[in-house]
């Protein structure tokens, strides 16, 4: 099914015509919902601290999680105390849940587990992002909130919007779900503050982002170790764009004898992964690693990646954030 969807969205498969009526329904529902917020029939919850939303207008992976981690580190370097909220895709969260560094991906979602394991940032997940944000403000000392995804979650007021675009796949066939990958039309990009292009080449004022690989880490203990690149590996990925990962490790010189794709956010079966690593080491993404750390074997590895953006983006974001923070601080003091 996943391969068929990819062919429809990105390779011109004619089955898209069968799905276009459903895309029309999707457009109508999305349009009415947005109108309700635009004309005040529904109110977005405005928070007392700046809110940065990191999302995209397409379904599937585009580099949001590395971008969120980059923002956490950038804000900390400039004296901010960021916190993060997320929906926790792939899991059923009862109410809101604070994510701890040892949280299981099966309880809070793979991206939240990865983000907190990497950064120890205060983070709350929940189906209702407004409730998650309010809990974050109540229970933690934060002065800026980053929403991991949620560009289309208009109930949450936001001050800065960052949209990610996959620089290789772009917008596919330019159709709305389910005939294409779009959650909203391309017009939506005109209203965001920054469009970040993951993998380039950048177009129309987009900010170019590169994902730089770090040394491999062992899945079972999360520690960097020296991997013998003469050893063959089975590469697996359960992410939005697994081919990007497979291409990356091949370009890095790893001897890939087999690639295995899983659905995004899919829970892994211990025996299934063990069978893949009987004769070869198993190499996966960091997001996949957090889902199988409890039963990982000694020849399972993951490839960490770090987002790299230019200083012009850093300056523009920090400048805009400072203005928002000053305005909200003034309002809280009745100025």
UniProtKB/Swiss-Prot annotation:
Signal peptide (residue range): none
Residues that bind ATP: 58-65
GO biological process, one term: lipid A biosynthetic process
TM region positions: none
Any one Gene Ontology molecular-function term assigned to this protein's record: ATP binding
Highest taxon of the lineage: Bacteria
Pathway membership: Glycolipid biosynthesis; lipid IV(A) biosynthesis; lipid IV(A) from (3R)-3-hydroxytetradecanoyl-[acyl-carrier-protein] and UDP-N-acetyl-alpha-D-glucosamine: step 6/6
Known EC number: 2.7.1.130
GO cellular component terms, semicolon-separated: plasma membrane
Catalytic reactions of this protein: a lipid A disaccharide + ATP = a lipid IVA + ADP + H(+)
InterPro entries given in the database record: LpxK (IPR003758), P-loop_NTPase (IPR027417)
Keywords assigned: ATP-binding, Kinase, Lipid A biosynthesis, Lipid biosynthesis, Lipid metabolism, Nucleotide-binding, Transferase
Family per similarity comment: Belongs to the LpxK family.
PANTHER family found in the cross-reference section: TETRAACYLDISACCHARIDE 4'-KINASE (PTHR42724), TETRAACYLDISACCHARIDE 4'-KINASE, MITOCHONDRIAL-RELATED (PTHR42724:SF1)
Purpose of the protein: Transfers the gamma-phosphate of ATP to the 4'-position of a tetraacyldisaccharide 1-phosphate intermediate (termed DS-1-P) to form tetraacyldisaccharide 1,4'-bis-phosphate (lipid IVA).
Protein name as catalogued: Tetraacyldisaccharide 4'-kinase
Organism name: Shewanella frigidimarina (strain NCIMB 400)
């Amino acid at each position: 099914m996943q391969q068929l969807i990819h062919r429809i969205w990105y390779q011109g498969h004619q089955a898209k015509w069968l799905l276009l009526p459903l895309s029309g329904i999707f457009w109508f529902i999305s349009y009415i919902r947005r109108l309700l917020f635009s004309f005040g029939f529904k109110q977005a919850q405005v928070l007392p601290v700046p809110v940065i939303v990191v999302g995209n207008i397409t379904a599937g992976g585009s580099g949001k999680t590395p971008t969120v981690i980059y923002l956490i580190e950038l804000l900390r370097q400039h004296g901010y105390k960021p916190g993060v909220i997320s929906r926790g895709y792939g899991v059923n969260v009862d109410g809101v849940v604070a994510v701890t560094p040892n949280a299981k991906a099966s309880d809070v979602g793979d991206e939240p587990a990865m983000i907190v394991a990497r950064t120890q940032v205060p983070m709350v997940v929940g189906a209702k992002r407004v409730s998650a944000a309010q809990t974050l403000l109540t229970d933690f000392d934060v002065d800026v909130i980053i929403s991991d995804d949620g560009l289309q979650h208009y109930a949450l007021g936001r001050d800065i919007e960052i949209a990610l675009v996959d620089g290789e796949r772009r917008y596919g066939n330019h159709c709305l779900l389910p005939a294409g990958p779009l959650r909203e039309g391309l017009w939506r990009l005109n209203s965001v503050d920054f469009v970040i292009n993951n993998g380039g080449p950048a177009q129309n004022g987009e900010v170019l982002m590169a994902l730089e690989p770090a040394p491999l880490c062992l899945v079972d203990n999360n520690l960097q170790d020296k991997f013998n690149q003469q050893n063959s590996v089975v590469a697996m990925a359960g992410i939005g764009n697994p081919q990007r990962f497979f291409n990356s490790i091949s370009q890095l010189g790893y001897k890939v004898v087999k690639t295995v794709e899983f659905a995004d956010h899919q829970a892994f079966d211990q025996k299934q992964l063990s069978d893949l690593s009987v004769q070869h080491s198993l190499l996966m993404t960091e997001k996949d690693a957090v889902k199988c750390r409890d039963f990982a074997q000694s020849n399972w590895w993951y490839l960490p990646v770090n987002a790299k953006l230019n200083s012009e983006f850093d300056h523009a974001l920090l400048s805009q954030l400072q203005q928002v923070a000053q305005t909200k601080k003034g309002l809280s003091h009745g100025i």
